[in-house]
Amino acid sequence: MRRDSSETKRKILTVCVRLFLEQGYKNTSVSQIVDEAGVARGSYLNLFPTKDRILLELTETMFGGQFGVARSIAHSKLPPVYAYAVETAIQLTLTELNENLREIYIEAYSLPETSEYIYLHTTAELKQIFGENFPDDTESDFYEMEIGTAGLMRSYMARKCDIHFPLERKLSRFLTAAMRVYRVPEEEQAKVLAFIQSLDIKAIATEVMYKLFAMLEMKYDFKLSKNGEMEETR
């Protein structure tokens, strides 16, 4: 029985992750999920009472390796704040490259379970990066600050770039606001912003996006429609 439940869960996740990436989170209905997965609606609801529970699984996978990518770009000789800046800049840029990813990230930052996962996942990283600026603060303090900076991130992701608000300005505005929260000195902020501006952040984020797609395809055993993917990333 447990094996059957595990196999049903695998089928559902495989279909859901593919559909979320190809057509968007909100455009994916429960009826479509159970039809394509070939499972009973009751079995689906027993495992995942809401779509939000599936999004939590996807969020855990997507956020798992983000800081690792950032650290490989902001090499170890640079202060930790550079890795934070690269990671958040990549995330903001990803949402400009693909509308379905934008929707997934915004939902993840909005829903109670997924946003709580993000707060908890990010808190330890923030303490490690900015701890010297807050010598008396605990992880609880960084958790509370993360609620605020995660709100900044969600708002900037939701506002699409245009000719009046280009990506470079969005990254600068977000990073300046976040670094001020974490007491990064103004002189250091200027150096961090100059470093980010020196990167081809769109090319880096595009590479990260395709690696993310490949990792999700491998983990959940599906193949994305190349047409749908390319239409979103032009």
Q: What feature does the model see in each segment?
A:
Residues 11, 19-53, 57:
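Helix-turn-helix
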